[in-house]
């Protein structure tokens, strides 16, 4: 469960850092201006990398302080972060960026002693360090640039990376390697915090500081997973786990080289551009790419023990089918009909009548507004014990909530919102881990509250939230992660407590989000509940006999 603490802290740090960076962006020159090649039409700050990188690294350094590989990874990540900030502010040349990438990768390969020693199709062959290290540097730089170049639409690169990281975290769980799990979940947390600001239309872009760090993290995790942590798995798994970005960058480079163009000149021939040209909306394009990426990473998990030949053949079959379909559609002039491609289903008449009833319309929101605070308090009051470290953190957060309330901050402010998420996660963790003497009853009551909250959220989001709350591609990622956890748990490979905790946390996060979008007062019930929950947890954790 420590991994999910790492993820929760990463989410909170990311969500708190990005608004600060957003205010500094114009002064630092970190603003992405629109041009004919880009999809956005207004200036957008390029500071998402602050939340992704710092939000991911801080929890990892706290949990794995003495690990040599993590030290090298953290140092390399900070180097890429520094070079990325430079590029986000000044638009440096590709050669300067390569210098930063080589420095970061070199640290991991030589100081962290991480390199490829076994390759697909040659199980008995062990590469010497003289060959394995240069090959690893080349491969990691390639992955960094593949993710960097896939960052073309709101939530695209971050979402693709998250899908890969979810699969890597699960494979790390199967291998029993805490570092793989921690690194993957921390980066998922930092990315989730960023996605809060990057769903279409984006308020923040990740910039090079974020995209290079994501590529670096994915590359390091894949090498470590297949070369050290999980050597019984196929050595070809990185193909499926990286998925679409690696094929996309190779296809784009081929088109540039065959067309006599500059290798590094940005063009509009990535997969997402081609889908947009075929009439797909932004939402449809991102969800389509997410779906392909999800299929590939699920394939990696299911085929982890299959032969390298089968894994590689599956990858190339999926990729070849995708590019063949795109090419045929483009040559035939096919366009998606927007009238027939709407993803919104018509509502049944009976449901519409219920949704139009003023009294019934207010009921789901009332349930959400009551159950979320009640669950928070239930978590602090009903559990058997609260660890002292929880008590210390809760006390600090209680002081932060009180300060924010006295300063006039509503639940919708970014700092308050992040604190609410952490409080909800604390309550969920405590109920799952320390249910108390009446454990079965406590769990059933918590399950009932989460079920009622999920039902109210489903009704509210689907039928009653035309203006204030809408589903986004990020919801696809959340649904994918939740379904994956449930399916893996049902197959006997997952941990029941982990699935329960994540389910609780996700439903509570959506509840906090719905309430926060509609709260104007600092004295709202949710704020008071968070303050009371954290205060009780602090007192019970620091003074168990009180």
PLM segments and residue spans:
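"…together with the soluble PPM/PP2C metallo-phosphatase catalytic core" -> "…together
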Residues: 1-249, 364-381, 394-408, 414-436, ...
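Membrane-interface capping segments at transmembrane-helix boundaries
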Residues: 20-24, 324-340, 517-523, 543-545
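Cytosolic, membrane-interface loops and tails of multi-pass inner-membrane proteins
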Residues: 20-44, 251-283, 334-355
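Juxtamembrane "helix exit" motif at the C-terminal ends of alpha-helical transmembrane segments
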Residues: 60, 297-306, 378-389, 540-541
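Extracellular/periplasmic helix-loop-helix junctions in multi-pass membrane proteins
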Residues: 66, 301-314, 493-497, 546
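C-terminal membrane module of polytopic membrane proteins
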Residues: 273, 277-338
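Loop-to-transmembrane boundary segments
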Residues: 277-289, 352-374
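Charged, amphipathic alpha-helical linkers/stalks
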Residues: 317-368
């Amino acid at each position: 469960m420590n991994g999910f603490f790492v993820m929760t802290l990463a989410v909170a740090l990311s969500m708190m850092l990005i608004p600060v960076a957003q205010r500094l962006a114009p002064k630092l020159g970190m603003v992405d201006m629109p041009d004919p090649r880009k999809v956005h039409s207004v200036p957008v700050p390029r500071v998402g990398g602050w939340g992704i990188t710092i939000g991911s690294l801080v929890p990892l350094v706290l949990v794995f302080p003495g690990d040599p590989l993590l030290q090298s990874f953290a140092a390399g990540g900070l180097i890429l972060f520094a070079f990325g900030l430079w590029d986000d502010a000044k638009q440096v040349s590709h050669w300067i960026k390569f210098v930063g990438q080589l420095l970061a990768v070199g640290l991991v390969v030589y100081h962290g002693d991480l390199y490829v020693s076994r390759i697909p199709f040659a199980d008995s062959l062990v590469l010497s360090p003289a060959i394995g290290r240069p090959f690893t540097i080349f491969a990691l730089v390639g992955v960094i640039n593949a993710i960097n170049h896939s960052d073309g639409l709101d939530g695209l690169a971050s979402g693709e990376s998250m899908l890969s990281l979810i699969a890597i975290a699960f494979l790390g769980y199967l291998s029993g390697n805490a570092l793989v799990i921690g690194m993957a979940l921390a980066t998922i947390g930092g990315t989730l915090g960023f996605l809060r600001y990057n769903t279409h239309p984006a308020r923040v872009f990740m910039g090079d500081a974020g995209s290079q760090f994501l590529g670096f993290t994915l590359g390091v995790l894949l090498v470590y997973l297949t070369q050290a942590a999980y050597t019984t798995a196929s050595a070809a798994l990185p193909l499926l786990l990286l998925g679409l970005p690696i094929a996309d960058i190779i296809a784009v480079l081929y088109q540039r080289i065959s067309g006599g163009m500059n290798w590094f000149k940005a063009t509009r021939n990535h997969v997402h551009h081609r889908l947009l040209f075929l009439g797909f909306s932004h939402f449809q394009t991102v969800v389509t790419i997410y779906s392909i990426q999800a299929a590939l990473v699920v394939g990696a998990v299911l085929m982890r023990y299959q032969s390298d030949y089968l894994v590689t053949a599956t990858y190339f079959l999926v990729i070849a089918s995708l590019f063949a379909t795109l090419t045929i559609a483009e040559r035939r002039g096919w366009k998606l009909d927007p009238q027939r491609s709407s993803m919104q289903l018509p509502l049944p008449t009976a449901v519409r009548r219920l949704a139009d009833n003023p009294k019934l319309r207010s009921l789901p929101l009332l349930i959400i507004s009551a159950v979320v605070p009640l669950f928070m308090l239930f978590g602090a009051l009903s559990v058997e014990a609260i660890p002292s470290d929880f008590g210390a953190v809760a006390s600090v957060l209680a002081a932060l909530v009180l300060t924010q309330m006295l300063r006039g901050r509503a639940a919708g402010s970014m700092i308050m919102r992040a604190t609410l998420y952490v409080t909800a996660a604390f309550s969920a963790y405590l109920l799952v881990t320390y249910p108390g003497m009446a454990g079965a009853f406590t769990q059933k009551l918590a399950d009932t509250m989460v079920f009622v909250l999920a039902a109210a959220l489903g009704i509210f989001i689907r039928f009653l939230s035309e203006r204030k709350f809408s589903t986004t591609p990020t919801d696809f990622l959340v649904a994918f992660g939740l379904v994956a956890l449930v399916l893996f748990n049902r197959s006997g490979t997952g941990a029941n407590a982990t699935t329960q905790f994540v389910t609780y946390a996700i439903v509570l996060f959506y509840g906090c989000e719905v309430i926060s979008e509609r709260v104007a007062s600092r004295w709202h019930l949710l704020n008071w509940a968070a303050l009371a929950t954290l205060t009780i947890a602090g007192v019970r954790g620091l003074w168990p006999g009180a």
